[in-house]
A protein has these predicted regions:
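RNA-interacting cores
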Residues: 1-169
Length: 169
């Protein structure tokens, strides 16, 4: 699963470059201030009643590519959507992704480089090796949900949409 490999790889790279406690998170004196904890396990300010375990994830990784084998030069496109307080950690996530490409992704340690980064409107954030922060434009969660609803096949036929969250049993 590419999303799991990317998530695990990002976490590993963030720990590698930011952890001062030998990756012993449970006993770390600095866990409340830890960048890795803030990005990978972003805490709710107010925890909704339907959340029964764990904390929020401060981002979503989406990958529609179901290809299992990649050759040199093949592209893997994915969306990394940051939420809440994770939005300000874009640079750290980008550095972790760059480091992951250098060290390799997955069981075969496939090396990669970042060829393009775009915002949701298609404007380049990465241009000729430079980051254009003015094109990094945070939006409200509502706009993400509304955009995803337009991708739902029956969205135009519905006047009211309800999301029901089920916690694991």
């Amino acid at each position: 699963n590419k999303v799991s490999a990317l998530r695990g790889g990002l976490g590993t790279m963030l720990l590698h470059s930011n952890c001062i406690s030998d990756k012993q998170c449970d006993s770390c004196f600095f866990s409340d201030e830890c960048l890795v904890q803030r990005i990978m396990y972003s805490k709710f300010d107010i925890k909704p009643a339907y959340i029964t375990t764990g904390e929020s994830v401060g981002y979503i990784l989406e990958c529609e590519n179901h290809k299992r084998n990649f050759q040199k030069g093949d592209l893997l496109e994915f969306d990394l959507i940051l939420f809440g307080k994770s939005i300000i950690h874009f640079s750290q996530l980008l550095q972790a992704l760059f480091s992951l490409g250098q060290s390799g992704l997955g069981a075969n340690k496939a090396h990669f480089s970042i060829s393009d980064i775009q915002n949701e409107t298609g404007k380049n954030i990465l241009c000729n090796g430079n980051i254009i922060m003015s094109n990094y434009q945070p939006h409200m969660l509502q706009s993400y949900v509304e955009h995803r609803l337009t991708e739902f096949p029956y969205a135009n036929e519905l006047s009211n949409v309800s999301l029901i969250f089920h916690s694991p049993t």
